[in-house]
Amino acid sequence: MGDRGYLVLPDMLTSQQKIGVLTTKRKDEEIRHYLDINEIGFDLLKKQAGQQVTAILDWDLRYHQMRIHSAVHLIHCILEQVTGHSIPYPVRSPLNDESGENHYQLLDYIDKDILEKATTELNEFCSSGHEIQTVNVPEQGNNFRIWKCGRWSIPCGGTHVKDTKEIGMIFSTLKIKKNMTRIALRLSDNSG
């Protein structure tokens, strides 16, 4: 899930009209903005080609994504701690407006009781406040970064909060189907 927000074009500055950015995606080393425009808006954009624009980020969405992204890494790490197993990285970790998930190949040693225990430990860990870092590792290649919190580290190039207190209360659910273990996390509305 990419960022959302608005673009304000030079001719629009006085009238405060905005063009919605529905999402952003990286493709071929470019950041592409997918816009909410009609034919009139498209004609206006063509006239403004090459002009500088002002981008307004939907910060509430971005901050939620940073919180949930950090939480899905932490639940993985704490599940390893609770189960005593090294857990393969998720095959997917999709984020959306409401939640974040880790999708694993079937993990038969994780059940609702284990997830409940891990979620309790996760909430205790987060509320006690721990620094979260993202560290560039240039010897691994361009743009290679590692997420770090406490003794844990995971390869990740995404955005994260700086402290676990910012995440807030976490709620979890477990679904097992079609040889997949899916752990979904939701956050309370309040952080820190």
Regions picked out by a protein language model, each given a short descriptive name:
Residues M1-G192:
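Active-/binding-site microenvironments in catalytic and ligand-binding cores
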